[in-house]
């Protein structure tokens, strides 16, 4: 990443890696493969912990005031990435800064600027819509009067005013997701993480939620969302990162990805990101300016050769 790309960015991530320990057989290290430990899993090494590698050398920036989407299948590392960015867990290595604050050195400062909505609604079904929002407002430090006033604003903003006194248990799936996102905005964050926000919604509810998400971006908020749906990334995102096998394998605007990956593509993987950058510079020097770099991978649409 260049200094120019990082300047004014909401998020800067460099060489992020994350793995989890997994149960091994009688405490013996595995022989290798996807679950092998960093030492390669030498045979017979007693007491070694097998590890599942979830993220490997992930780097990217998120411009302030944009919607950036991470697209990938289940298990691609999307939720782990969001959990690291939102300070819920720490990475094994790499650097993460949010609005110039390091997530390890100043997690409290980072949390003051962000909000997160997970895959499953965090609302209390035994409370009404209004009671849920007032409750979350109080949790975020608002006094009773301010929490009530903010709840009224959010109910109107997310088209829930007519259901304000209805128990959340009676809400439809789309209404619950809107209420869940509204609860994240009781104190307006600079950055909102949305982890698969439309999972399980019908097409009409999904389109409605997309409209609310776009409005938040238009109001100046930065949003990072994960999704399994290509059409959702295309509909919402200013920039898309494709996560596969623990790495970002493609990045660009939706239009760029359609253009560059809508035909046969040559992909070359390197041991280091520096090697990939050097190779891409050589290609661009040969007038192949469509060479794209994503971490340690260089991609070139063959239609441009």
Each language-model region and where it sits:
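N-terminal acidic, proline/glycine-rich, low-complexity intrinsically disordered segments
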Residues: 1-4
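Short coil/turn motifs at beta-sheet boundaries
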Residues: 6, 51, 174, 259-261, ...
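ABC transporter nucleotide-binding domains
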Residues: 8-13, 18-25, 31, 39-244, ...
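ABC transporter nucleotide-binding domain
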Residues: 211-301
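Conserved small/polar residues in nucleotide/adenosyl-binding loops
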Residues: 303-305
């Amino acid at each position: 990443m260049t200094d120019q790309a990082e300047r004014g960015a909401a998020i800067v991530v460099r060489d992020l890696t994350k793995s989890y320990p997994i149960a091994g057989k009688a405490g013996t290290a595995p022989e290798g493969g996807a679950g092998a430990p960093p030492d390669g899993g030498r045979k017979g090494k007693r007491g070694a912990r097998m590890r599942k590698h979830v993220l490997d050398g992930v780097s990217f920036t998120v411009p302030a005031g944009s919607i950036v989407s991470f697209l990938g299948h289940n298990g691609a590392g999307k939720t782990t990435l969001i959990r690291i960015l939102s300070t819920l867990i720490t990475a094994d290595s790499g650097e993460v800064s949010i609005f110039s604050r390091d997530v390890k050195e100043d997690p409290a400062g980072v949390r003051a600027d962000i909000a997160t909505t997970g895959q499953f609604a965090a609302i209390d079904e035994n409370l009404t819509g209004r009671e849920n929002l007032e409750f979350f407002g109080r949790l975020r430090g608002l006094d009773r009067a301010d929490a009530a006033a903010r709840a009224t604003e959010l109910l109107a903003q997310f088209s829930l005013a007519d259901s304000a006194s209805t128990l959340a248990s009676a809400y439809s799936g789309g209404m619950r997701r809107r209420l869940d996102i509204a609860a994240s905005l009781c104190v307006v964050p600079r950055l909102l993480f949305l982890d698969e926000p439309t999972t399980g919604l019908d097409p009409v509810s999904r389109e409605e939620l997309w409209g609310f998400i776009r409005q938040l971006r238009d109001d100046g908020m930065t949003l990072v969302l994960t999704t399994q749906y290509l059409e959702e990334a295309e509909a919402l995102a200013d920039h898309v990162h494709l996560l596969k096998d623990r790495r970002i394998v493609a990045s660009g605007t939706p239009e760029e990805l359609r253009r560059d990956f809508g035909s046969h593509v040559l992909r070359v993987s390197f041991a280091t990101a520096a090697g990939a950058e050097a190779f891409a510079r050589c290609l661009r020097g040969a007038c192949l300016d469509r060479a794209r770099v994503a971490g340690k991978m260089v991609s070139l649409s063959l239609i441009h050769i």
